[in-house]
């Protein structure tokens, strides 16, 4: 009898563990922009929701309420409307409500910092894992928008390796090109 009770208890525990797992309502959102602080001049934080057709994003701030819509799984905020919202809500916390169909609903916050971000960043554009290094570009991106500008392309220099090193605090920056036509460009305070 004692063994039978133990078997029933174990069976009950096993069956209880077979229930469906609760799903995270934001498992399909990419990138995850939930509960963050953003600079007051940052480019729109566009995002995707997997398998969503129509998406509604309602943003509530102290100075207003803003409505955005997404289609085919993509929320792409209009740049002017986005920047107007950030200017109006600088220093405030925004509540963001996202709805996609009946199964995808949740809220999160964005705190709009009073500090702005530096407008430009530069980076070396290369295939992942450095496996195809022959196609290297040095680009500059305006982080308040999505505009990019090509600064260098190794296809114009016999496919030589390009290293771009920029420093913060407006110090000396340099770009180095390896190979038979290699060289280095030094920049200090905007002067080459």
Stretch-by-stretch model annotation:
Residues 18-192:
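Sequence signature of WD/YWTD-type beta-propeller architectures
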Residues 1-7:
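Bacterial N-terminal signal peptides that target proteins for export
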Residues 8-16:
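Bacterial N-terminal signal peptides
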């Amino acid at each position: 009898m004692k063994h039978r009770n133990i078997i029933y208890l174990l069976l009950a525990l096993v069956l209880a563990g077979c229930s469906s797992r609760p799903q995270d309502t934001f498992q399909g959102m990419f990138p995850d922009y939930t509960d963050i602080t953003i600079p007051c001049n940052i480019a729109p934080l566009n995002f995707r929701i997997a398998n969503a057709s129509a998406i509604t994003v309602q943003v509530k701030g102290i100075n207003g309420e803003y409505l955005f819509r997404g289609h085919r799984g993509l929320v792409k905020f209009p740049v002017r409307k986005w920047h107007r919202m950030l200017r109006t809500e600088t220093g405030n916390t925004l509540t963001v409500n996202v709805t996609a169909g009946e199964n995808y609903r949740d809220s999160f916050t964005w705190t709009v910092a009073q500090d702005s971000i530096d407008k430009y960043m530069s980076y070396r554009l290369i295939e992942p894992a450095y496996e195809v290094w022959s196609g290297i570009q040095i680009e500059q991106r305006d982080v308040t928008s999505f505009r990019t500008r090509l600064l260098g392309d190794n296809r114009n220099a016999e496919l030589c390796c390009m290293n771009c090193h920029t420093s913060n605090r407006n110090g000396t920056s340099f770009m180095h090109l390896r190979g038979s036509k290699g060289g280095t460009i030094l920049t200090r305070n905007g002067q080459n």
